[in-house]
Amino acid sequence: MPDGGLIIAIDGPSGTGKSTTSRALATRLNAKYLDTGAMYRVATLHVLNQGIDPADTDAVITATAALPLAISDDPSSTEVLLAGVDVQTEIRGPEVTSHVSAVSAIPEVRDNLVNLQRALADRAHRCVVEGRDIGTVVLVDAPVKAYLTASPEVRAQRRYDQDTAAGRAADFDEVLAAVVKRDELDSTRAASPLKPAEDAHIIDTSAMTMDEVLTHLIQLTEASAERSNQ
C-alpha cells in the first residue's frame, strides 16, 4: 500500500455504495475518512431545527454561516455533532433527505463547506474524501478520483434496505421517486452539479459486491502510487 500523503476523491449519487466502500478503503489504507454529504445534511438539519424554510435562501445563508459542526474523520466512527449533540440518526431522516438538495444548491452554503472540507483534507494529509463534487470542485488535484454509479432501481433498493435495517419506515416506490428526483436536482443545479470529473474512473456498482468495488479502488490507488514514483 502507498505510504505518505494520499488523497482519494470518491464521488457519485446516493445508493452506489460510496459510504461503505469509502470507509473500508480508508481503513485498508490507514487513512482518515471525510463524509462531505453528512456536512450538508447537518446544515440542512440546523436550518430545519431553527424553523427556517429551506427555500428562504438569505435565511439559510445566515443560519449556516457559522455552522456549529464537528465530524469524525475516523472511518470506524459515524459520529456527527451539531452544537455538541450527535445527530447521526437525525441527518438520515426523511425530512432532511427531502430538503438537503435545496440547501446544498445554495452557492454560499457550498462555498463555506467546501473551504472547511479542503482544510480538513489538508490536515488529514492521508484521507478518503466522499461526496458529489470532490473531484470536480473540492479537490481537483486529487491523484485518485473515482465516480461510483448504479441504476436508480438498484440504488433505491439499497436505500430501502438501509432504512428498514435501521428501523425507519420506508416504501420502495417512494424511495425510488426520491432517488430520481434528487438525481435531477443535483445534476442540474448551477453550483457544483453532480457529474464525474474528466479524469475520474467511472465504476458501475450495480452488479458488484462491496469487496469487488474495494479491490478496484485499491488497484487504482496502487497504480497511481506507481506512476508518481516513476
Swiss-Prot record:
SUPFAM superfamilies: P-loop containing nucleoside triphosphate hydrolases (SSF52540)
One cellular component (GO) term of this entry: cytosol
Entry keyword annotation includes RNA-binding: no
GO molecular function: ATP binding; CMP kinase activity; dCMP kinase activity
GO biological process, one term: pyrimidine nucleotide metabolic process
First-listed, main subcellular location of the protein, grouped into a coarse class: cytoplasm
Keywords from the named record: ATP-binding, Cytoplasm, Kinase, Nucleotide-binding, Transferase
Homology family: Belongs to the cytidylate kinase family. Type 1 subfamily.
Protein name: Cytidylate kinase
UniProt gene name: cmk
Entry EC number(s): 2.7.4.25
Intracellular or extracellular location(s): Cytoplasm
Reactions it catalyzes: CMP + ATP = CDP + ADP; dCMP + ATP = dCDP + ADP
